[in-house]
Amino acid sequence: MRASFFWFLPLLLILASVAQGQPRPKPGIRRKPKPRPTPSFPQPHEPAEPTDLPPPLPPGPPSVFPDCPRECYCPPDFPSALYCDSRNLRKVPIIPPRIHYLYLQNNFITELPVESFKNATGLRWINLDNNRIRKVDQRVLEKLPGLAFLYMDKNQLEEVPSALPRNLEQLRLSQNLISRIPPGVFSKLENLLLLDLQHNRLSDGVFKADTFQGLKNLMQLNLAHNILRRMPPKVPPAIHQLYLDSNKIETIPSGYFKDFPNLAFIRMNYNKLSDRGLPKNSFNISNLLVLHLSHNKISNVPAISNKLEHLYLNNNSIEKINGTQICPSNLVAFHDFSSDLENVPHLRYLRLDGNFLKPPIPLDLMMCFRLLQSVVI
């Protein structure tokens, strides 16, 4: 027994020495937990700063006119005109006194400095379309008594400019951000013939009973593509053309058009007009020549006058049409074509497609409107 113990003893010593030579296992490294990523949300797109704009075009060759701004063009054969359009301008140059026609469209102009116009008192025409103008200093317009044409389409105006010159004949302010019309802004514009306010943010509350007061000779009024629900009040009686497309108008007050003896053209496409909102004889106007009522909710063809030549009723809810009922003249016998053309309905073009009608065209319709050249169903 003792002999066997001594035999195992060397073996145990060898195993102990091998175990002592092995490296001890290192303690595990404790890593810090990674922070959870915070959710990211898309940031709103910021408008481009002026530094992002393309650089102005290099100045052209010297002009024959010493006072011609280098960034513009002064045509030798048209000394009263100054062309500064489409040149990536940020500022309006100094306008020479000899200039009557000023072209500044398609630039990046944000304001109209008084200094630029102080000597240009003879201006008659200014085109500022497609710029970035937010407001017009009334001191600029006050010093332009002869200005007749002011074009400021495609800018960032929020209200109609004040202190408009008395001799203004055309004022174009479409495709802006206009939601306000200052009181009395049109009161002295007796010579204004055209007022274009389409594609703005005009609502019913903007138009008061005296908004158009003073526009005694206005011939064309364009209020299309706004947010009107009612017909504008007190439209000047001299009006010839009225544009109200793409609003939300549902009703036309009874007798609304009776005070417009010269009204020849009405556009009211893309509204919410229905039979309920159209009193009888709403459009039976003596001098009306063209009537657009497409894309509404009309179920019956409205009464029209003898003189109407073009009628657009496409894309409505019309299911049937009775030529005898809509005929503006009481013709005793359809087969007897009267030689008095004044009493024959003048309708030449009738559009009815996009309704619930099917060919053929009713015979009584053709018998009434003998001058019809085109009918679209």
Curated annotation (Swiss-Prot):
UniProt keyword Repeat present: yes
Query: What Gene3D superfamilies does the record point to?
Result: Ribonuclease Inhibitor
Per UniProt, the ranges with Pro residues bias are: 36-45, 52-61
Disulphide bridges in this chain? Answer: 327-368
**Cellular component per GO, a single term:** extracellular space
Where do glycans attach? 119, 284, 315, 322
> Which SMART domains would you find in this protein's record?
LRR_BAC (SM00364), LRR_TYP (SM00369), LRRNT (SM00013)
Tell me where the signal peptide lies. Answer: 1-21
Q: Where is this region: Disordered?
A: 22-61
Primary localization class, coarse: secreted
Entry note about domains: The basic N-terminal Arg/Pro-rich region binds heparin and heparan sulfate. Binds collagens type I and type II through its leucine-rich repeat domain.
Fill in the subunit field for this protein. Binds the basement membrane heparan sulfate proteoglycan perlecan and triple helical collagens type I and type II.
Question: Of which family is this protein a member?
Answer: Belongs to the small leucine-rich proteoglycan (SLRP) family. SLRP class II subfamily.
Designated name of the protein: Prolargin
Tell me which species this is from.
Rattus norvegicus
